[in-house]
Amino acid sequence: MGKIIVCNTKTAQNPYTFLNTKVSVYSYEELCYYLYNNMVLVGEEDLSAKLSAWIRRELDLAELADKIDALLEKHAFVQDIMVEILVYGGYYSSEEVRQFMAECQKLRTLKPYEIEKLRADGYLRYKHYIKAGAIYDEIICYLKK
């Protein structure tokens, strides 16, 4: 069963597509939802100058784009950029953002194979079976060593 995302901001004419999952988002709210629910699948290649340009051009959110650009110049962690996006428009409550940040902290304490397992699970949710299977195989090989 899907969820309804109420969009209060401008809807983009051209979507932003996340490379790993091929999921396209058309609004700030969809972007927030995707980031919040797929943190282990989001990488540096997703949160780049291309994203800030899309936010500026398609969503008319220049202030958010400027904040992302500043974080990119500082080579900030991916999680810090995601938090900036989540906080910006108030789509998630401060408590939900705190939970997100706690989950980010928890990820930093996991072993690499545990993070990879979470990534594989994420790909499985998106029916990217080959990618998920390859990661699961790598984990099994790693654990057998």
Language-model features and meaning:
Residues 105-142:
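Alpha-helical segment of the N-proximal tetratricopeptide repeat
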